[in-house]
Amino acid sequence: MKFFLKTALASTMAVALVSTPAQASEVCQDGEIVIKFSHVTNTDKHPKGIAATALAERVNSEMDGKVCMEVYPNSTLYDDGKVLEAMLLGDVQMAAPSLSKFEKYTKQYRLFDLPFMFKNMDAIDAFQSSETGQEMKSAMVKRGILGLEFWHNGLKQLSATEPLLTPSDAAGMKFRVMASDVLVAQFKALDAVPQKMAFSEVYQGLQSGTIQGQENTYSNIYGKKFFEVQDSVTESNHGILDYMVVTSTEFWDGLPNDIRNQLETILREVTVSRNAQSFAVNEANKEAISATGKTIHVLTDEQRAQWKAAMLPVWDEFKDDVGQENIDAAQAINAQY
């Protein structure tokens, strides 16, 4: 069936078609509803890229003749900073930016950037599946954006040019952060210097010394080869990096009911399947990083408590934006894990 995996040519802005055994090369047919899905990661090592590929394969197989989904990975169409505006203009129909990228449209998702909010991925999954978590998917409806599903990446780790074992080790170092005021405050709490930078620019920033460190999941550290230009990784599990699959309310509400219902069902099934495997993907990437000879420092309970104590004041700074009731709901669930 027709499935597009768009990749950018190295020297131009052209987009090339890539076909694999699981993806036939026919173009979208006349009369089909075309859904362009734009994301910023690779297609085979990253939980989001794997999930987007799986979603398109299901849609193009099961909705042949009705819907055609094209996937544009690796920022070949838009980066996360521009994709939401493109979606509102109708140039993209689906995307899955990290939860940090919705600052312009809602402050509620700052909850997911607050350091040490959740103990593990099970707690995160339970909260996102709860009534409070599900209600948060509609936080941007008045701005024309509808949240469809939460997609997991994983827990964030720290990497730097020097070992990071205590909070004082980060002092004075420049760390890349996403465009999130919470993450800026998080690194300022460590007396570090946060620098907002696009995901696509991080490798070069680390290589050139513009930044000395960054926070990310193992899948991002391995998939984007950040480990090549970092001396070590610290397994801190201090935060989460998750995504929300979104669409525009105009596009979604304009779909025939049967089409919308079938898309919802397929997306839900892909989400459950891929979220369950995100931990294994990150663990495999962790092992791959270790196999290159890079050192991975696993914090002791005492060391992790020091990092938590240093970062926890950030909660108070943003509790009004997030909503104390949302923090309380998250912590009530977190206490069960």
Task: List the predicted regions and their residue ranges.
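Short, low-complexity disordered leader/linker segments with a strong preference
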Residues: 1-34, 337
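N-terminal secretory/targeting leader peptides
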Residues: 25-123, 131-132, 140-337
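Short, solvent-exposed secondary-structure boundary motifs
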Residues: 17, 135-140
